[in-house]
Amino acid sequence: AIGFVLFAYQANAAEIIPYGSFNYKLSNDENSSGKSYSKLEDNGSSIGVEVIDLGVEGDTITGFAKLEVGVDTDDSGSDTFDSKLAYVGLDSNMGSLSVGRQSHPFTDNIGGKTSIFNVYGGGSDWNYGSRSSNSMKFSTTQSGLTLDTIGIVDGSSTNTNAFDEFEVTISTKLLGSDISVGYADDVNSDISYWGV
């Protein structure tokens, strides 16, 4: 007798979310001679797609992915698109783990919170890095505290047994405000950064 074993499961339909922004600005500045001029230009337009809840019903681990590109709406040449984010990962009740081109927690949770003058270059604050390829990121939230970490392994360090760069931030809400503390270590330059 030949027996067949059938596995019954119900696959969750992954949620696919397309998104984008058209960001254009009109500014009035002065040149180096003090002469006023107006300029109309792209200010960071983007398009992307996010995929969440890739998994099987009842599973405690699900998948996710994101692909986002910057769109230079003023470009008449061949550099219209610029890679922003491109990653895949797994999510569980312990946290999420992802690999690819991702944003830096130090910038997301500390430096990026004070970048209020984006029109003029966002020079009001210092950011360690905004996005990096060749990265592995882990995030988890427990008891109101969120831990975000990223490690970059791009082969540029002479220390072959370690990450080339890594960061960690701990964040929470206090009296309605986001509070974060973070550490970033650039192994290549042998420089460490702290931020609050």
Question: Which residue ranges define each predicted feature?
Answer:
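Outer-membrane beta-barrel proteins
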Residues: 1-196
